Amino acid sequence: MSNPSRHLSVDEVSQLVEAHFPQVQEGNGRVSIERLEADETVARMAHDDRVIRPGGTVSGPAMFKLADFAVYAAILGRLGTAGLQAVTTNMTINFLSRPQPADLIARARLMKVGRRLAIAEVKLYSQGSAQIVAHATSTYALPPPALRG
C-alpha cells in the first residue's frame, strides 16, 4: 500500500482512516471522501445542525476540519500507509462567503509532495454552488523517507 507510484482508491483510504483515525468521525460534522485522483481529492462534510453557529452559518472550526481532512486523505492517497504519520504543521484558511445550509464540499490539490513536507491548497464550496466559501493552504510534515516503507 505504500508504493508512491500507485494511488490508493477512495475505499482504501477510507479504510485506513477508519482503522487508524476513527475519532475523525466523532462529534459534529461527519466527513467522507468522494473522489481521489492524482491531481484532486474531493471530500464532503454532511450537513449537521450541530455545526451551525449563531447567525445561521457553518462554524469556522467545522470548515477547518473538512479542509484538513481533505488534505490528509490526499496524502494517504498518494503515499498509502506511509502517510499515516503525516501531521499538519500549518494551515491558513480564509472564509470568503457564508456557506449555504447544505453539505460542504472540499476540493484539495497537493501542490508539492517532497521528502519532508507536503503543500496543499483546498477550496470549500456549498453543495450545488460554484462559489468558493473558504480557501485554505496547508503544510504537512511527512515521515522521513526511511520510515515510509
What is each PLM-predicted segment?
Residues S2-L8, S97-P101, I105, M111-G149:
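HotDog/MaoC-like acyl-thioester-processing domains
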Residues M45, A67, M91, V122, ...:
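Conserved GNAT-family N-acetyltransferase fold
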Residues M1-R44:
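Non-catalytic linker/capping segments at the edges of enzyme domains
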Residues A74-I105, L110:
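Hydrophobic beta-strand-centered segment that forms part of the acyl-chain substrate-binding groove
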Residues H47-G56, M63:
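A short interface-forming secondary-structure element
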Residues G29, D39-T41, G60, Q85-M91, ...:
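A generic structural signal for short beta-strands and their flanking turns/coil linkers
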Residues A38, D48-I52, F69-Y72:
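Short, charged/polar surface micro-motifs in flexible loops or helix N-caps
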Residues P61-T81:
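Active-site helix/loop of acyl-thioester processing domains in fatty-acid/polyketide metabolism
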